[in-house]
Amino acid sequence: MRIAVIDLFCGMGGFSQGAIDAGAEVILSVDSWDYAVKVHKENHPDVKIIKMELGHPSHYRMFKRLVDEYRAKGYHVHIHGSPPCQALSNASRRDASEGMPLVLWFLDLVERCDPDSWSMENVVPVRKRLPEGTPSVVLNSADFGVAQTRRRCYAGEGWVAEPSHSKEDWLGVINVLPHLNDLIGYAPANSMKSHFKHKRIQDPFPTVTSQSPRQLRLMMDSGRSSSKTSGINPRTGKKEGGSGPLFREVNQPSYTVMSSPRVLKTDEPQKIRSLTLPETLILQGFNPDYKLDSAKTQKNRWTMVGNAVPPPVAAAVIRGVQNGVFN
């Protein structure tokens, strides 16, 4: 049975890309942001995409007709949605209730359209605000081969996303961006290995010696260096409150990709350079050649990349649908 996907609040096309990678047919994508629609169309010219402000009850009938049409053709129809989530994020100071209307609208749409399966991606805090009985899980992108520990709530039915990577096998930034080794260019001297052995990435740098320039480790800024809402204590690296610089070595998965570039630093730390957009696309699970020119400005590009669903996670959801349909 063929799988048809309707992708709502589609952005630049992360879920659409993953669905296509998994062998599904995306029959419609919808978003209200003109630049995101243009980028989506540029990368998926064969997918019908509509620029439309979602959230009105009058839209239910339109999507119900589409579900019925493709079901009659023998398709399994899957509806996905990624309603805007800024007010629901842990990093937001806005009232979280501001972010719920479109979430509830989407859930109502699913109930009225009755697709064969559905999924909704949002930030983790939305999970506790979902109506009672709404099935949901928290998925970590690193479990699906993405070099980033991006955790998101996925509500839905008709699928189970099976991880492809255990924690021991998570991809580090350096695994997917091996050219960053050129910024390191050293192996710690044997005499220093025990000195570094018990040092965490949050600890002060050891005694500076003539070998120090070759013993600096390349690290990635979390992007939350002064956030008071991250809940991370920079001294211990644990979720116990606090704010301040927070870094992770590049042999580990990236922090969640957001709408601004990650900064590469040394262990002092001292900025080397920011990650480029093609590098950040890779950290999100996209092909680095994914076309962003239609977005016009760098700010628009960073925003849509930071908001995108990592395609490998979307592909895992659709493969979960396939496993349920074909087994």
What are these regions (language model features)?
Residues 1-5:
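Extreme N-terminal starter segment of soluble prokaryotic enzymes
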Residues 8-12:
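Class I SAM-dependent methyltransferase "Motif I" SAM/SAH-binding loop
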Residues 18-25, 43:
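A short, Lys/Arg-enriched amphipathic alpha-helix followed by its capping loop at the start of a domain
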Residues 33-34:
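Conserved SAM/SAH-binding beta-strand->alpha-helix loop
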Residues 38-71:
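S-adenosyl-L-methionine
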Residues 59-250, 255-256, 272:
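Class I S-adenosyl-L-methionine
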Residues 314:
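Acidic-aromatic/histidine active-site loop/patch
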